[in-house]
A protein has these predicted regions:
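NAD(P)+-binding Rossmann beta1-loop-alpha1 motif at the extreme N-terminus of oxidoreductases
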Residues: 1-61
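Internal alpha-helical scaffold of NAD(P)-dependent oxidoreductase catalytic cores
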Residues: 6, 49-53, 113-121, 134-221
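Short, well-ordered alpha-helices that flank and scaffold nucleotide-derived cofactor binding pockets
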Residues: 21, 25-29, 52, 86-90, ...
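Short, hydrophobic beta-strand segments that form beta-sheet elements in well-ordered domains
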Residues: 35-39, 98-100, 145-149, 262
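Rossmann-like NAD(P)(H) cofactor-binding subdomain of soluble oxidoreductases
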Residues: 53-137
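Interdomain hinge/lid region at the active-site interface
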Residues: 217-275, 280-282
Length: 282
């Protein structure tokens, strides 16, 4: 499939969640035509919303979604990618490209489909970006990095969206996605903890936002090791001990784990601080 050379390009979306709808909407904004949306059912709210946004028809069966489409986006939960894609085999056009959007799963999830239809291309495309809604996602996609796997057409598709594609080995996808989860989901959970601890101290959580933004900017400018500041980086065990004493047991446990990561990042050889951080939770 020649993604950038076709004047009439049609796509279908299977799995109208936030990521799938965002990617499909971005392509429609770039001249693609959406011809079909398949979800849990044609009447499901997510299916209706995606179809209305994309100007596409709602199909009852996944098996019918590929008809007339140059590109099929599979954005279902990971556990059903293989079977969902395989169901497309009877309707796919010769030369069509089928991509899934999973971060953790390799292109191999589409092997069953490719075995049945060797005349179509299959690949994986995972934008390394948080896409909480199509409206927000459309603003965030351009310039974001994107993990791709498959034929050159997958990379061309990513570039057409303004993404910055990179390739990773199939065996490294789970590790890659774990890194993305730590950087996004776990960071959000950590910031939620920081907000809760600040609130307990009578500090408005929004007061932390300039510090959070500055920390991310410092990592961008300097790298993690040089951006690290604070008591662990200074070897200030007395302050760390006061922090641990002030925190509830669950918060202290998280603090110890992350402080050990900070100590390793700092490169400090500080047995006393290590012993403090390895101590029993209160």
């Amino acid at each position: 499939m020649h993604v950038q050379s076709r004047s009439q390009r049609a796509l279908a979306l299977v799995g109208p969640g936030r990521a799938g709808t965002t990617v499909a909407a971005a392509l429609v904004a770039r001249g693609w035509t959406a011809v079909a949306v398949a979800g849990r059912s044609p009447a499901a709210a997510s299916t209706r919303a995606a179809a209305d946004r994309l100007g596409a028809s709602r199909v009852t069966e996944v098996a019918d979604a590929g008809r007339g489409a140059d590109l099929v986006i599979v954005a279902t939960p990971d556990a059903v990618i293989a079977d969902t894609a395989a169901a497309l085999a009877t309707s796919l056009e010769t030369g069509a490209l089928v991509v899934h959007l999973s971060g953790a799963c390799p292109r191999d999830e589409l092997d069953k489909l490719h075995a049945a239809r060797p005349d179509v291309e299959v690949g994986a495309l995972h934008p390394l970006q948080s896409l909480p809604s199509p409206d927000v996602g459309l603003q965030r996609l351009p310039g974001s990095w994107c993990a791709v796997e498959g034929p050159p057409s997958v990379e061309r598709l990513a570039l057409s969206l303004g993404l910055r594609p990179f390739r990773i080995a199939p065996g490294d996808r789970a590790r890659y996605h774990a890194a993305a989860t730590i950087a996004s989901n776990h960071l959000v959970a950590l910031l939620g903890q920081a907000a809760r601890v600040a609130d307990a101290a009578g500090v408005p959580p929004e007061a932390l936002l300039p510090l959070i933004r500055a920390s991310v900017d410092n990592v961008d400018a300097l790298g993690p090791a040089d951006a690290l500041t604070g008591p662990v980086a200074r070897g200030d065990g007395d302050t760390v001990a006061r922090h641990l004493e002030a925190l509830a047991p669950g918060d202290a446990l998280t603090y110890r784990v992350l402080a050990r990561e900070a100590l390793a990042l700092s490169g400090r050889d500080d047995p006393a601080l290590r012993e403090l951080l390895d101590g029993d939770e209160r």
